[in-house]
């Protein structure tokens, strides 16, 4: 049986931590920034850890060799 391929789009958007959690960048920072306060924009910086179920789905369906 051949190796499973990792989805390229998911590979670019998510990272796995050493403990197996899935990390993604914050959503909602591409446009419509004028209507947001400076504090809201500042809070969108950096990354966030996905909830358990979302992380499980990413690892199971899109990252076949991620820790399950």
UniProtKB/Swiss-Prot annotation:
Keyword tags: Ribonucleoprotein, Ribosomal protein
Protein name: Large ribosomal subunit protein bL35
GO cellular-component term (any): cytosolic large ribosomal subunit
SUPFAM superfamilies linked to this entry: L35p-like
Molecular-function GO terms, alphabetical: structural constituent of ribosome
Listed NCBIfam families: rpmI_bact
Database matches in Gene3D superfamilies: 4.10.410.60
GO terms classed as biological process: translation
PANTHER family given in the database record: 54S RIBOSOMAL PROTEIN BL35M (PTHR33343), LARGE RIBOSOMAL SUBUNIT PROTEIN BL35M (PTHR33343:SF1)
PROSITE patterns per UniProt: RIBOSOMAL_L35
Family indicated by similarity: Belongs to the bacterial ribosomal protein bL35 family.
Organism: Rickettsia bellii (strain OSU 85-389)
Name of a matching Pfam family: Ribosomal_L35p
């Amino acid at each position: 049986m051949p190796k499973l391929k990792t989805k390229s789009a998911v590979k670019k958007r998510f990272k796995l931590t050493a403990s197996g959690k899935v990390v993604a960048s914050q959503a909602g920072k591409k446009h419509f920034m004028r209507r947001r306060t400076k504090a809201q924009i500042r809070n969108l910086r950096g990354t966030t850890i996905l909830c358990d179920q979302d992380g499980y789905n990413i690892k199971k369906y899109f990252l076949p060799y991620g820790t399950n």
